Amino acid sequence: MAAAIASSLIRQKRQAREREKSNACKCVSSPSKGKTSCDKNKLNVFSRVKLFGSKKRRRRRPEPQLKGIVTKLYSRQGYHLQLQADGTIDGTKDEDSTYTLFNLIPVGLRVVAIQGVQTKLYLAMNSEGYLYTSELFTPECKFKESVFENYYVTYSSMIYRQQQSGRGWYLGLNKEGEIMKGNHVKKNKPAAHFLPKPLKVAMYKEPSLHDLTEFSRSGSGTPTKSRSVSGVLNGGKSMSHNEST
């Protein structure tokens, strides 16, 4: 079967070559004004050669785009969550503060990264329940977004929770507008409730996930960059040993 197909193809090619030769002879013997059918055949041949001889340009694949929002997060305690230039996380009554703007970037099903618009720092929670900020996106920067009653939203760590009860560790502000330890915040209390105030829809590149071990300090598992350890562990505010327990 394969041999028959091959011989048929060879025969077809031979016939095609013979037709091209006869057409070329007719073109030479009978010149006329304007373009002849022979000229058109030549143009077609040249165009095919140019087409197949040229290198195809590789189209750049568009980078993955994630549809998120630029928003403010209004706490039920009466404060706007803010992430200041030095990495401090707290609440403020100043609605016009540019540090209250956050990028909410979807990184999974009902999972978001919370990034300060001005600082480009990510909110994160470590294995002890402390909130801190990170220049790089790590697993500690992932928060589960859950809608509570009256359209309030809670944000809990994706990787840390109470070992025995399984209760989540939540982002929260106390009545003074201070950041709280995640394991001290209960989801049914006002401290954990935030009301997003979306300003616009935005498209984001998918953050590059970095391993915690690359940036952890020995014995802590908390990434530290230019800020002090005490500052990182309490949202940017110094903390005594008694306050940390």
From Swiss-Prot:
Record's subcellular location: Cell projection, Filopodium; Cell projection, Growth cone; Cell projection, Dendrite; Cell membrane, Sarcolemma
Gene Ontology MF terms in the entry: beta-tubulin binding; growth factor activity; microtubule binding; sodium channel regulator activity; transmembrane transporter binding
Protein name: Fibroblast growth factor 13
GO biological process: branching morphogenesis of a nerve; cell-cell signaling; cerebral cortex cell migration; establishment of neuroblast polarity; hippocampus development; inhibitory synapse assembly; learning; MAPK cascade
Outcome, altering residue 14 to T: In DEE90; loss of ability to induce SCN8A long-term inactivation; no effect on pro-excitatory properties; no effect on interaction with SCN8A
The family this protein is said to belong to: Belongs to the heparin-binding growth factors family.
UniProt-reported outcome of changing residue 207 to Q: Loss of interaction with SCN1A
Organism, as annotated: Homo sapiens
Region feature (Mediates interaction with sodium channels): 67-201
